[in-house]
């Protein structure tokens, strides 16, 4: 009997070890968590393509998993057993960090931050119809606000705080479901203003080659819109093309690229920006195997630098990442303090 019990115990332990060792295999794949912040179908299909590429590069089995909303993504992190990484928005990552720490007593890791248009931060843009008569942030008082969903950093959390701090009371709210859907609602006149992500206009290639780029304090639509006389500039309308073109890189870009609303710049403008928000990036749950984490990080860095990878990551209907940059979780500490999050002990 003792011999049977001993053999049974050995078998159970062996199976446990084998199960742990098989993380990253078809039987137990790593899960790449995605959030539905832009075009849900595009995010899902692009995430699948990225997961397949990372599997090919690393030899680890990786499957993309589209969560229905931010709370579901956070739950995936806090309940994971060292087998989850993801591309979470800033607010989603910070909430996942807190919940995971509460549940496990351990901290998530944040080794890569995204780069968009040369920046590792972004802003909330307050967008309005140009014919609305809304010209300043203060003019938003009493107006109907369209936002993506409550878990969105730039779409809801930051603007909600800024509107409240400024004493602005909106005349109503509409939850649209995504940044793109918010823009559609504004374009159709269903809301008076929206809050959505803003990345600065991209300078012409000849200026970029000289190191020039948009800086905070510059015209919010530099090279894109001329208010006197009112007209659009840039590649979007064909007014200026080639090496002298400026490019729209904010929430309106996707609608220009797919031709859905070719007059979106003529119809929709920006009246204000939020304070800067650190970009989203690549995060891992606690206890993710160190060697596999390093392999995945290296694979993302190499893949996004290829034409195939860059086309996937930079798609404005995905997450519009031009590149990634090494970082640590500490990059969020100033933002944590500004938004009332506790700075973790490390």
Language-model segments: residues:
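Solvent-exposed, polar/charged alpha-helical surfaces in well-ordered, non-transmembrane soluble domains
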Residues: 48, 52, 56, 71, ...
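Short, low-complexity disordered leader/linker segments with a strong preference
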Residues: 1-27, 346
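Short helix-initiation/N-cap motifs at beta->coil->alpha
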Residues: 64-79, 89-91, 168-184
């Amino acid at each position: 009997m003792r011999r049977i019990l001993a053999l049974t115990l050995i078998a159970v332990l062996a199976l446990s070890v084998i199960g742990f060792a098989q993380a990253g295999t078809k039987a137990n794949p790593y899960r790449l968590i995605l959030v539905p912040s832009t075009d849900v179908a595009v995010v899902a299909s692009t995430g699948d393509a990225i997961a397949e590429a990372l599997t090919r590069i690393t030899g680890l089995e990786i499957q993309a998993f589209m969560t229905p909303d931010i709370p579901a993504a956070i739950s995936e992190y806090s309940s994971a057993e060292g087998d989850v990484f993801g591309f979470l928005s800033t607010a989603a990552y910070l909430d996942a960090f807190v919940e995971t720490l509460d549940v496990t007593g351990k901290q998530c890791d944040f080794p890569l931050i995204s780069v968009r248009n040369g920046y590792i931060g972004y802003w909330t843009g307050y967008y309005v119809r140009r014919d609305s008569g809304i010209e300043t942030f203060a003019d938003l008082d009493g107006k109907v606000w369209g936002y993506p969903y409550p878990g969105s950093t730039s779409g809801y959390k930051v603007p909600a705080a800024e509107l409240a701090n400024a004493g602005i009371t909106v005349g109503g709210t509409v939850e649209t479901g995504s940044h793109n859907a918010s823009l559609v609602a504004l374009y159709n006149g269903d809301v008076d203003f929206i809050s959505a992500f803003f990345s600065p206009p991209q300078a012409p290639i000849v200026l970029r080659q000289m190191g020039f780029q948009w800086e905070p304090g510059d015209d919010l639509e530099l090279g894109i819109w001329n208010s006197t006389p009112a007209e659009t500039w840039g590649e979007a309308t064909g007014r200026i093309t080639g090496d002298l073109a400026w490019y729209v890189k904010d929430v309106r870009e996707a609608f220009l690229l797919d031709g859905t609303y070719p007059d979106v710049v003529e119809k929709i403008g920006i009246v204000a920006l939020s304070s800067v928000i650190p970009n989203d990036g690549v995060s891992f749950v606690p206890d993710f195997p160190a060697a596999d984490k390093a392999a995945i990080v290296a694979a993302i860095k190499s893949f996004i630098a290829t034409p195939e990878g860059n086309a996937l990551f930079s798609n404005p209907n995905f997450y519009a990442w031009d590149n990634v940059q090494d970082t640590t979780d500490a990059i969020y500490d100033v933002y944590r303090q500004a938004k009332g999050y506790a700075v973790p002990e490390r």
